[in-house]
Amino acid sequence: MTCPRNVTPNSYAEPLAAPGGGERYSRSAGMYMQSGSDFNCGVMRGCGLAPSLSKRDEGGSPSLTLNTYPSYLSQLDSWGDPKAAYRLEQPVGRPLSSCSYPPSVKEENVCCMYSAEKRAKSGPEAALYSHPLPESCLGEHEVPVPSYYRASPSYSALDKTPHCSGANDFEAPFEQRASLNPRAEHLESPQLGGKVSFPETPKSDNQTPSPSEIKTEQSLAGPKGSPSESEKERAKTADCSPDTSDNEAKEEIKAENTTGNWLTAKSGRKKRCPYTKHQTLELEKEFLFNMYLTRERRLEISKTINLTDRQVKIWFQNRRMKLKKMNRENRIRELTSNFNFT
């Protein structure tokens, strides 16, 4: 909105000074106008500067022109466009000399990185400055911000990718990790070899036991266990020797010699020493004549077949139990055969 030069302030002050216009406001002129005792001109509501009116009915002098009040013309734009009156003034572009802060403010050496959303918001604000920041302080989308001006509470070191000067920086953490693994192997290896005394001072990583040493320890532990097994077998054969015949002892010796081969290895518990065919035939023949033997007859049979009295007694007991079981099964089979389950 533009105003001509020859307009007098009377045209603006007339509605306020008129009797009809004054009725819309309070009788006192101070509600919309300052007193002109201190200043030559007063501030009118929404109209910038205007000559002060001491009384309500008194108007401005027609001889005065707007040229006498240059500040009044500067406020016409804001009076014409009310929205522009509340617009904030943007800062004028000015160069930044350096990134340093006054000594009273704490400064961090770490540069924090803004996220993608914050970079998009801070983009138009950065365009206000005519000169860019120096490269020493501004990296790739990085702005040095002190701790209390930090954009987010999270640590910036986690978001920032590490900039390593050379290959040595990468090798350092891997060497530390590698130093832990040989230590774990060193702790596990003595368990394979049996009881080994640990030294007071830990061994270095270069002194870890080689696989050949572990094999020798296992081979030493093997012969130690084998004599104990052979002694147990000999003790068992010694217990059975008075009750078994010479043929059975020979068969047991042959079995002991063949236990080393994995093809003939026996699984489960050790079976009893079986009777020979000749012994079983004589016992079966005697069982057919009489299932129960007297003491005298049992001693005679034991001498003839080279068995002890106790062995013959146990064989007859087992044979009777077997016969009883067979008779029970045959009886059940006969009973079930009479019924037709259809």
UniProtKB/Swiss-Prot annotation:
SUPFAM superfamilies in alphabetical order: Homeodomain-like (SSF46689)
Subcellular location: Nucleus
Phosphothreonine PTM sites in chain numbering: 8
PANTHER family: HOMEOBOX PROTEIN ABDOMINAL-B (PTHR45874), HOMEOBOX PROTEIN HOX-C10 (PTHR45874:SF2)
One Pfam family recorded for the sequence: Homeodomain
Single GO biological process annotation from the record: proximal/distal pattern formation
UniProt keyword list: Developmental protein, DNA-binding, Homeobox, Isopeptide bond, Nucleus, Phosphoprotein, Transcription, Transcription regulation, Ubl conjugation
Ranges of biased composition (kind: Polar residues): 1-11, 204-219
Taxonomy, superkingdom: Eukaryota
Residue numbers carrying Phosphoserine: 189
Family indicated by similarity: Belongs to the Abd-B homeobox family.
Covalent crosslink: Glycyl lysine isopeptide (Lys-Gly) (interchain with G-Cter in SUMO2): 106, 195, 254
DNA-binding region, residue range(s): 268-327
Cellular component, GO annotation: nuclear body; nucleus
Primary role: Sequence-specific transcription factor which is part of a developmental regulatory system that provides cells with specific positional identities on the anterior-posterior axis.
GO molecular function, one term: DNA-binding transcription factor activity, RNA polymerase II-specific
CDD domains linked to this entry: homeodomain
Gene: HOXC10
Source organism of the structure: Macaca mulatta
Name this protein carries in UniProt: Homeobox protein Hox-C10
Keyword Phosphoprotein found: yes
Chain positions covered by the region annotation Disordered: 1-29, 187-271
